[in-house]
Amino acid sequence: MDAHVAFSGFPTLPSVSPSGPQPPSLAGDEPGREPEEVVGGGDSEPPAAPGPGRRRRRPLQRGKPPYSYIALIAMALAHAPGRRLTLAAIYRFITERFAFYRDSPRKWQNSIRHNLTLNDCFVKVPREPGNPGKGNYWTLDPAAADMFDNGSFLRRRKRFKRTELPAPPPPPFPYAPFPPAPAPAPAPPARLFRLDSLLGLQTEPPGPLAPEPPCCAAPDASFPPCAAAASPPLYSPAPERLGLPAPLPAEPLLALAGSAGALGPLGAGEAYLRQPGFPPGLERYL
């Protein structure tokens, strides 16, 4: 609806040309009485030429249009070519259509911006990547097209409430910054340990055993040398179960003990057996 339709009730009066006759003097008017003033809500009309016996009229004051901010925004969007406008374009439409909003723009522009963000009937449309410019577009929700009675912006039926906010459609592929990534391939299942694989592992053969220290024979002859070595151990696990080499028999140890007795008793501080043919003078390196 055009904004000037609301103010079309006033009759159109002829205008005064600069070369026309000058208005007569108002000396015959009653003293102490002001001329009549007509207050309206639209644009000012040109002063009418006072005829004989008529009083002079003042210019009409600029009144506020009888439209709410929601109606002003909906009016601007309805007159847009693509039914969408930026915030700056909405400001421009209002100031060009209504002269009242040309003064003090900061007050009413804040109200326009708040009504755009707080009312569900207005939807923000992002700007396409290939469309340069500043700011997003605003459009009217298609479900709110019948928000006003009979297309009149003076009467609004009820507050529009959107049940769910639909997501804006994604831009087409040429305008997308990156092509859509393919779906990742399913990961292979994790490898599980099986009992057969654990039993099939071969144990590494252990390293060479440290040589056992020789038995120390006490000076007392009543204690037989290497008696502890000749006694069998309390517990001897099966060597084939542990994968260890079989222990040495006790006969070489007894033979070694016999050779130690033939060499004679150990002196004080000697904790080793001197083998035959050992060169003298090397004990200090042991």
Curated annotation (Swiss-Prot):
GO terms for cellular component: nucleus; transcription regulator complex. GO terms for molecular function: DNA binding; DNA-binding transcription factor activity; DNA-binding transcription factor activity, RNA polymerase II-specific; RNA polymerase II cis-regulatory region sequence-specific DNA binding; sequence-specific DNA binding. InterPro entries: Fork_head_dom, FOX_domain-containing, TF_fork_head_CS_1, TF_fork_head_CS_2, WH-like_DNA-bd_sf, WH_DNA-bd_sf. Residues 64-158 bind DNA. Its main location: nucleus. It is found in: Nucleus. GO terms for biological process: anatomical structure morphogenesis; camera-type eye development; cell development; cell differentiation; ciliary body morphogenesis; cornea development in camera-type eye; epithelial cell proliferation; eye development. PANTHER family: FORKHEAD BOX PROTEIN (PTHR11829), FORKHEAD BOX PROTEIN E3 (PTHR11829:SF156). Keywords: DNA-binding, Nucleus, Transcription, Transcription regulation. SUPFAM superfamilies: Winged helix' DNA-binding domain. CDD domains: FH_FOXE. Disulfide bonds: none annotated. This is Forkhead box protein E3. It comes from Rattus norvegicus (Rat). It holds the Pfam family Forkhead. Residues 1-62 are annotated as: Disordered. Transcription factor that controls lens epithelial cell growth through regulation of proliferation, apoptosis and cell cycle. During lens development, controls the ratio of the lens fiber cells to the cells of the anterior lens epithelium by regulating the rate of proliferation and differentiation. Controls lens vesicle closure and subsequent separation of the lens vesicle from ectoderm. Controls the expression of DNAJB1 in a pathway that is crucial for the development of the anterior segment of the eye. SMART domains: FH.
